[in-house]
């Protein structure tokens, strides 16, 4: 057993043994989140067993729903991942902080389905460490722990794993050796829409109906769509007089349901000498999850949830953290610099026509202070400059093809 496997087993066992050792106000929070984590631990075993491949469509739907249940519809109103509910239940001192922890735990389905043991373990350990801090404090002093103690646990979670966060971000941009999504796209029976559930994303009606619609199209039509998409990318280099023959990879970003088109596009790109880079949009707020999504992604289980937690970084964003993140990104770019220099840029499939999203302005959202806003702008600026240092903007391109969300409309393209 590896060290990481031992850590995973210890954290898992501790979660399953959570006891009633504190006032009901906090006990409910830890019990409900422990129950959710217990469901995900069973999901981890189920995915690892391979049983998913033989499961019925109805069973797959049940599993998918269980991963996202408390973010769905009206369930979110009484979820500890909802800032206003968490504040009402946990109080002014801990409401926002423990809500941010709950939100971070909701990123776990992505790590579960990719069988990313480290990504799972560090989030289980975050929860266990915070639980133990509360349990020990109530046992020893009959009082809740100091806010600073719990905030420091969350801060050091973000800071200690900044190296992992940065490595993920850069690898997901340029490393064509990633196989998770590619294996599904290239090897699954795409005529059987059960394949959609293997991605570990929320599967809504749009993904389901889109995949069914594309399955009903002849191969010639699929190829024509893929050709329009990939030719747009090639012509971008041609028109800008940029050397495509120097490049070895292209990042494919798309919403789930388009797998038949993406599979055909992959073959087109390979004929150009480009290997596909296909990675998930960030699932974790610590890794950059937001309303606007990059990479491959499923349905938006709850855009209000994404909006509510975009500024959870207010709990750890300071000069020290920014310096560490930039240092970690620099190290990650150095690690992947040979892949970065031959990266051609993103080829994007978009969907338009979604119902407009108007977020509710909740009273207890975390917000960045003026100083933090300044720091974040500085971080974004330096991170962007670093990207341009390793992927020369004069030698990369971009294309986008867009389709209406509703499959009842005629498909249209823009490149």
Where are these regions (language model features)?
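Active-site bordering "gate/hinge" segments
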Residues: 2-415
């Amino acid at each position: 057993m590896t060290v990481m496997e031992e850590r995973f087993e210890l954290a898992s066992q501790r979660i399953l043994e959570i006891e009633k050792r504190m006032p009901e106000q906090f006990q409910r929070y830890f019990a409900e989140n422990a129950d959710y984590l217990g469901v995900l631990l069973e999901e981890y075993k189920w995915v690892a067993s391979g049983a998913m491949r033989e499961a019925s469509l109805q069973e797959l739907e049940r599993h998918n729903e269980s991963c996202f249940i408390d973010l769905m519809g009206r369930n979110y109103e009484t979820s500890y991942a909802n800032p206003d509910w968490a504040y009402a239940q946990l109080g002014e001192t801990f409401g926002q902080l423990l809500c941010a922890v709950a939100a971070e735990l909701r990123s776990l389905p992505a790590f579960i389905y990719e069988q990313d043991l480290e990504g799972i373990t560090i989030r289980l350990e975050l929860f266990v460490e915070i639980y133990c801090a509360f349990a020990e404090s109530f046992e020893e002093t009959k009082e809740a722990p100091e806010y600073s103690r719990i905030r420091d646990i969350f801060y050091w979670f973000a800071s200690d794993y900044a190296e992992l966060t940065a490595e993920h971000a850069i690898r997901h941009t340029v490393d064509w050796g990633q196989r998770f999504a590619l294996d599904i796209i290239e090897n699954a029976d795409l005529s059987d829409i059960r394949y959609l559930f293997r991605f570990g994303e929320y599967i809504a009606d749009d993904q389901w109906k889109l995949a069914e619609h594309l399955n009903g199209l002849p191969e010639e039509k699929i190829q024509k769509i893929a050709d329009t998409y990939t030719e747009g990318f090639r012509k971008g280099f041609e028109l800008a007089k940029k050397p495509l023959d120097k490049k070895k990879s292209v990042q494919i970003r798309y919403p789930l349901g388009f797998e038949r088109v993406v599979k055909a596009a992959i073959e087109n790109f390979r004929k150009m000498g480009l290997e596909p880079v296909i990675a998930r949009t960030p699932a974790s707020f610590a890794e950059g999850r937001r309303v606007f999504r990059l990479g491959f992604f499923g349905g938006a289980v709850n855009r209000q949830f994404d909006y509510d937690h975009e500024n959870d970084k207010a709990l750890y964003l300071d000069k020290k953290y920014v310096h560490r993140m930039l240092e970690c990104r620099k190290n990650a770019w150095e690690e992947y610099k040979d892949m970065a220099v031959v990266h051609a840029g993103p080829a994007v499939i978009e969907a338009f026509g979604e119902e407009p999203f108007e977020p509710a302005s909740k009273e207890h959202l975390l917000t960045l202070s003026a100083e933090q806003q300044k720091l974040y702008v500085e971080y974004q600026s330096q991170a962007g400059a670093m990207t341009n240092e390793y992927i020369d903007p004069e030698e990369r391109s971009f294309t986008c093809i867009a389709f209406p969300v509703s499959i009842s409309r005629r498909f249209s393209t823009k490149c």
